[in-house]
């Protein structure tokens, strides 16, 4: 997809459009754009690493809760792993691949159970923060596909971002995020990027040039804002940007490619207060009932939308995770 140079085209986008290697992440510029008190104030940048999640785990082991708020970012991951062991595609194409350490201090004698409400809020807030950052970049169509993907584009939304959240079972969590920013996507691709979507905006749209530094700075600012609010407030914002409510989905108990007798179609009613997906089955033994689904147990495909693939398939920069009550190691 070619994009006409205009006032909305950044030098990073011009490099991508010309087929040149994307410029490396500008750390001083990111710092100048950051409006947080903690999140992102410490940034560890790597040109290439097997996995930012592994580096984050190592930092937590070495520093514990002192590492709270650190962002570990890589231009490329060579062995990224998403939910359920799926591949996390992360080539050096001008996207954002990073892990953020969330390590709040616990009261004396506290344990991981006390952190569950906060972790549920973090899981939901991450998707909202991606949506807010996408809107700030001029992509108003960005919405959340339960549990933690962000899709964007009209009339057929496609996968733009995904997250995964790992909890150590004690006092810390690592949030892994992938956002397609500068990579130019083909029209028939199952994923999209902020740059690709902006190419279709009308000429009169007044949006600033896109940059990875600005997207990450906005994400950190929004996540810090959301995590300082209540779970109810985060749920309300998540629901405001819900892509699936009122749509028909296919519920898969294995994968989209592997049919299972227990699979069924359902109407999405929304998410409950724990982040589970509320649906009304349209066929099968529970037809007509209202039930809740966990992203740890099922995957879903919106039947009216065909551009973004099954939840968790490596179509975009990252794989999603369960938005329900977190569990140790894989949420």
Q: What function would you assign to each model-found segment?
A:
Residues 170-205:
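Short, acidic (Asp/Glu-rich) active-site segment that either coordinates a divalent metal cofactor
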